[in-house]
Amino acid sequence: MADVEVPVLIVGGGGCGLTASIFLSELGVESLLVERHESTSHLPKAHYLNQRTMEIFRQHGIADSVYAVGTPLENFGKVRWRTSLGGDGPLDARTFYTMDGFGGGSLYDLYAADSPCLSSNLPQIRLEPILRRHAEDRAPGRVRFGHELVAFVEDAEGVTATVQDRAADSTYEVRAQYMIAADGGKTWSEKLGVTMQGPSGLLDMVSTHFRADLSDYAD
């Protein structure tokens, strides 16, 4: 007999895993979330939360927590294309174009007519702790950071998983009807045979995390 028996095992404690835990709890479905890292992300990652996302957060009692710490719409409601943020060269610090975006400025009434929820701007490094708190409040003891899935066996009725408590250096067995692979698609998703269809490698993108006083660029 397994040490833990739950309807759903969630592997991964990022945005997807934590929201899955919250939503299942709201539906009265018991789950266990395991995340191999000791804490939520230390990197900003994604930051824009559109109106539909905020509607779902509102439905599950999360929206107010996000709005309380998110960037006010008046501070992110424009998009500006520039050659650079600074520099003294002839092509530095030039603005190509500026437009309202994300429901700010001239777009406010249009966006407000579509939804009772405005969009928000909160980097993942600050969003995930909020989601973790809501998940833990709804499922005490069932959101386990520092616990890593190390093996699983699937059968007709579900999965039997082996989870390692990394701090205690011990393992335990979990039996679940369903397992959600919310680990970012680079580990257990591959082992499950989940593949991406269609063209890949369409473009390269680079994220840069920096601190700067950008007040000179704000209208």
Kindly give the residue locations of the regions a language model identified:
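Core beta-strand elements of the Rossmann-like FAD/NAD(P) dinucleotide-binding domain
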Residues: 4-6, 167-178
